[in-house]
UniProtKB/Swiss-Prot annotation:
Keywords: ATP-binding, DNA damage, DNA repair, DNA-binding, Nucleotide-binding. PANTHER family: DNA MISMATCH REPAIR PROTEIN MSH1, MITOCHONDRIAL, DNA MISMATCH REPAIR PROTEIN MUTS FAMILY MEMBER. It comes from Cronobacter sakazakii (strain ATCC BAA-894). The gene is mutS. Signal peptide: none annotated. This protein is involved in the repair of mismatches in DNA. It is possible that it carries out the mismatch recognition step. This protein has a weak ATPase activity. This is DNA mismatch repair protein MutS. It comes from the Bacteria.
Amino acid sequence: MSTSETFDAHTPMMQQYLKLKAQHPDILLFYRMGDFYELFYDDAKRASQLLDISLTKRGASAGEPIPMAGVPHHAVENYLAKLVNLGESVAICEQIGDPATSKGPVERKVVRIVTPGTISDEALLQERQDNLLAAIWQDSKGFGYATLDISSGRFRVSEPQDRETMAAELQRTNPAELLYAEDFAEMSLIEGRRGLRRRPLWEFELDTARQQLNLQFGTRDLVGFGVENAPRGLCAAGCLLQYVKDTQRTSLPHIRSITMERQQDGIIMDAATRRNLEITQNLAGGVENTLASVLDCTVTPMGSRMLKRWLHMPVRDTSVLRHRQQAIAALMEYSTEIQPVLRQVGDLERILARLALRTARPRDLARMRHAFQQLPTLNTLLADIEAEYVQTLREQMGDFAELRDLLERAIIEAPPVLVRDGGVIAPGYHEELDEWRALADGATDYLDRLEIREREKLGIDTLKVGFNAVHGYFIQVSRGQSHMVPIHYVRRQTLKNAERYIIPELKEYEDKVLTSKGKALALEKQLYDELFDLLLPHLAELQKSAAALAELDVLTNLAERADTLNYHCPTLTDKPGIRLVEGRHPVVERVLNEPFIANPLSLSPQRRMLIITGPNMGGKSTYMRQTALIVLMAYIGSFVPAEQAEIGPIDRIFTRVGAADDLASGRSTFMVEMTETANILHNATEHSLVLMDEIGRGTSTYDGLSLAWACAESLANRIKALTLFATHYFELTQLPEKMEGVANVHLDAIEHGDTIAFMHSVQDGAASKSYGLAVAALAGVPKEVIKRARQKLRELESLSGNAAATQVDGTQMSLLAAAEETSPAVEALENLDPDSLSPRQALEWIYRLKSLV
């Protein structure tokens, strides 16, 4: 921006603009001028590129032409949505003064700041997805993380202990905007994320955070919220709350509490596991063929968002899960009656947030009224359902008969979009408003009478009375009869074929009508604001009702899914292990054209690891993933795709399946694989479910097999986790003979000549062969290459006596034999105590070691 000249050299309007822009230097400023929001200087250039709008110039100020771009005020929401999706923030500056009475530029001020994480307008939000603002803090003891959904008031804090846990939280919550301290050390953790906002250190100060939070909640301390002993989480929460207050510039009555999220309350899944299981997002970044796409047939947006939160944070409290299971079982026969009524409730949660922020529009209040009108029907439908938890939700839903009556009296049936358009308050609600409206609406009768009278009196048959927004009321006469008008007709406008006039009587009436319209509109705005004052005292009960309705939607949806997709209620037991009868993959079975082959699974302390072999495309990965998804579904309270399921305590789910280069971080496929494996070996427990697919394949055969063997050994013997271990290293099928708790299973296939038929059936024991060449032929590898490969395979098998492919000697694998022979030099070093040697003895040892190598 060209500001080298003195401030006084600018025009008064540009001085006003520059003052406001100086308060918001890092974000775009939408500056209201009449029917447009204008942007100037660098903002104009940036907006022109981002929004693909014209960049023009507006005169000059301080001797320089001013770059300018603008958007019409009636279409501003579309442009804001585009900017927010690009991660931009925008300050909205409105005219608050009256142009008619202003001397100099009309008074303006920034009334709100729209940022990706603080939007509540439905036009800017994705209705079936949470939109979170987050803040992250780090000190020597770990991380603090806070999230807020301003469109619901849901405020959460956590204290991830390490980088992996923090990465998993970022993946789970996927914030639209992330605040971080200016000295944040782990930038690689957040780089490349959308909506990053660097904040000064003082905003993360602990005492300030406590003060801010107590002020918001009207409390003396935070003990009642269970966050008092979470200093890192509070630092993040304090910064977040300050940012929301700065951007919203209004009170936030819907943010009434803060909740501590503890890892031990839910099943922990790291970022790789969430990605690999394709819970709400597939590996390509879309939403098709995910677990959510199968399970989410909710009928309200708030129900859909709640279901996705459940899927990303399964709970371990079995009493909560049993309540959900009982509710789902009870709702199964009622789902077809309940869902159509729930559909009419809409997104009450977000409407209440806009009510709290005083940004709710007339149609929001009409939708709220419509939601209230569904409650009596829902109450009647739920009254006969015996499940205790359904009755709890029914009580929390409430009735709100008084508020329903208020909105039925106050708001017309189909209100306009904006209150400033008028016609929002229903006739009969307020006597004075009806009087002003009658005066304004009576204009039509008066004008008809005036037109007939003047036409007959003057004998001008082309005379008619009309109105337009620019010139107001007028009497129009054709050009051919204009000579017949009397002297008191004052010409107001000349058209091609007509003249328009005003007379004192019509001018007087015009003033009266315009005054009445203005007064009616002003009174209507006042009454609309008073409605907020009447509704807001009930906000807490209304939010509780919205949460109950959302949960009822989720449970009814899960009941419908269970009934439609033949899911059964799992048994959650204290006995460790997982036992599935006829288990199915919930997503794959929906996309297959042929019947899905269901398979059993049995894991227990006595059979805690399955070594899974079989051909590529045989179904190993599907079998493993379906187990994890069934466990995940069971731990949100859902029924599962299995004839029977008995599932013991699970604290974490880990997956090490597939990998791609992480080129941005300079990590190869093998490095990514080993990083994920290290995370599992460090963090898995005996109650964890671990899926390991093709471990060690990214390096040489010797290295890969060694690593796979050692990892399997560690998981089975040291950690004792419930493990599904898929491999092409047939040497690993000897593990059951060497350690307890390990068993072989394989996916069946039948080879006939050059073709292969995958049976997708899980059988006990190891696979007899790999079928790799048959799969390669199926994939279209040229026949001459397959032929040469068969020839080479026979050569290799004869060279090694088939040892590399199938055999293991009495005590150890042939492939690992060389690796496991300890060097004499290493043995000598292991037995050596360097602290006991004199310099002379040390020198002698060097010569001795040299001779051993």
